[in-house]
C-alpha cells in the first residue's frame, strides 16, 4: 500500500507539533502497537551504539541482537537521509563514526 503524499505531510506536521517528551510518549503509545514501539526504541538504541564508535559485531553483542539488525542500522547511518545523525547531534549524543 502506497501512502498518499497528503497523508505523509499530515503525519510530518503531527510530529512537528510535539512540544515535550511527555507529548511524544502520548502520541507514540496511541499511534503504535506495543511491539512497534519496542522495535522503534530498539532501533534508536542500536543507532546510538553504532554512532558511538562500536563495530557492528561489538554492537550486536552489546545489544544482544542479530548482526542483520545492526547492519541495517549501519546502512541507514551511512546512506540514509541524514536524519539519524541530525538528531544524534541535536540531542548531543556521542557521534564517533558516520559524521
Where are each of the predicted segments found?
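Short, Lys/Arg-enriched anionic-surface-contact patches
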Residues: 23-43
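Intrinsically disordered, low-complexity basic tails/linkers immediately adjacent to helix-turn-helix/homeobox/MYB/SANT
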Residues: 87-99
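Short alpha-helical "recognition helix" segments of helix-turn-helix
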Residues: 58-63
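Short, amphipathic alpha-helical "recognition" segments used to contact nucleic acids or chromatin
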Residues: 40-54
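General nucleic-acid-binding
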Residues: 1-16
